[in-house]
């Protein structure tokens, strides 16, 4: 009888982690993720809390400084051994810094407002004697004169020319002697003329004054003024019937304009 013997097959080696190890790794992963998520709001809270603590500490220092300053003003500085002079100097420097900051803000605000607005245009010139005795009056930048902007110029000493269009208040005052020769009966006439950049000249305003029989110079003044729309390059000038009767000098005869 032949007996056969079969060798048992080797047992297969188990692969993979045990179930307990898998559970441990899962719990560890959940814990780490939870800790990471929870640390973010905690860090934000801690940062805000530190800022608040610093602010409270600063306020406390300010309160202590003010309290010490009050004690100095009450004459208790020598008793508490406080350096009152140093504290007063620090307080004065602080007040100066605050005042300077306010002034700088006001200046910046004013400059911004001025930048948004149109530049101010104004002119005022006084009469000047003309040896030619021309009917168009001569003007000069002397005495109490004004040339507020380079957008208005005095051309040829006779006319004010604007370089920007807009509404302008234009005025003139002419002072003259009202006495006349017996044969001359013409009134003294003052005319404010407009010379546009293109086109013919025209009268804006006109006024007249009758003569006087007095042989002495009786000073009289004619004032003309009105609001007109002037184009860029337009000019204004004054014409009189008898230039020899005009009285020149500061306060007597003048012409001016102001952009509204």
UniProtKB/Swiss-Prot annotation:
GO terms assigned for molecular function: CD40 receptor binding; cytokine activity; integrin binding; protein serine/threonine kinase activator activity; tumor necrosis factor receptor binding
Site (Cleavage): 111-112
Topology relative to the membrane: Single-pass type II membrane protein
THD domain boundaries: 121-260
TM region positions: 23-43
UniProt-listed Pfam families: TNF
Residues bearing carbohydrate: 239
Modification note: The soluble form derives from the membrane form by proteolytic processing.
Superkingdom of origin organism: Eukaryota
Keywords recorded for this protein, A-Z: Cell membrane, Cytokine, Disulfide bond, Glycoprotein, Membrane, Secreted, Signal-anchor, Transmembrane, Transmembrane helix
GO biological process: one example: cell surface receptor signaling pathway
Function text: Cytokine that acts as a ligand to CD40/TNFRSF5. Costimulates T-cell proliferation and cytokine production. Its cross-linking on T-cells generates a costimulatory signal which enhances the production of IL4 and IL10 in conjunction with the TCR/CD3 ligation and CD28 costimulation. Induces the activation of NF-kappa-B. Induces the activation of kinases MAPK8 and PAK2 in T-cells. Mediates B-cell proliferation in the absence of co-stimulus as well as IgE production in the presence of IL4. Involved in immunoglobulin class switching.
UniProt subunit comment: Homotrimer. Interacts with CD28. CD40 ligand, soluble form: Exists as either a monomer or a homotrimer. Forms a ternary complex between CD40 and integrins for CD40-CD40LG signaling.
Family: Belongs to the tumor necrosis factor family.
Protein name, entry field: CD40 ligand
Organism: Rattus norvegicus (Rat)
Designated gene of the protein: Cd40lg
């Amino acid at each position: 009888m032949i007996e056969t013997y079969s060798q048992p097959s080797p047992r297969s080696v188990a692969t993979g982690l045990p179930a307990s190890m898998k559970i441990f790794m899962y719990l560890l992963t959940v814990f780490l993720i939870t800790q990471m998520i929870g640390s973010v709001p905690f860090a934000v809270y801690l940062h805000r809390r530190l800022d608040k603590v610093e602010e409270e500490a600063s306020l406390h220092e300010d309160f202590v400084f003010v309290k010490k300053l009050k004690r100095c003003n009450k004459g208790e500085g020598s008793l508490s051994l406080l350096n009152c002079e140093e504290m007063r100097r620090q307080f004065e420097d602080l007040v100066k810094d605050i005042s300077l900051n306010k002034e700088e803000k006001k200046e910046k605000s004013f400059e911004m407002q001025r930048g948004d607005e149109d530049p101010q245009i104004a002119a005022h010139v006084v009469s000047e004697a003309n040896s030619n005795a021309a009917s168009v009056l001569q003007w000069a930048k002397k005495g109490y004169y004004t040339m507020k902007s380079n957008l208005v110029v005095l051309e040829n000493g006779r006319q004010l020319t604007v370089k920007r269009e807009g509404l302008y208040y234009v005025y003139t005052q002419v002072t003259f002697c009202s006495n006349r020769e017996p044969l001359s009966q013409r009134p003294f006439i003052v005319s404010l003329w407009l010379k546009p950049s293109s086109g013919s000249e025209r009268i804006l305003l006109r006024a007249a004054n009758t003569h006087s029989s007095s042989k002495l110079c009786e000073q009289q003044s004619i004032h003309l003024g009105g609001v007109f729309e002037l184009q860029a390059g337009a000019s204004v000038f004054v014409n009189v019937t008898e230039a020899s009767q005009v009285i020149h000098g500061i306060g007597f005869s003048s012409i001016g304009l102001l952009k509204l």
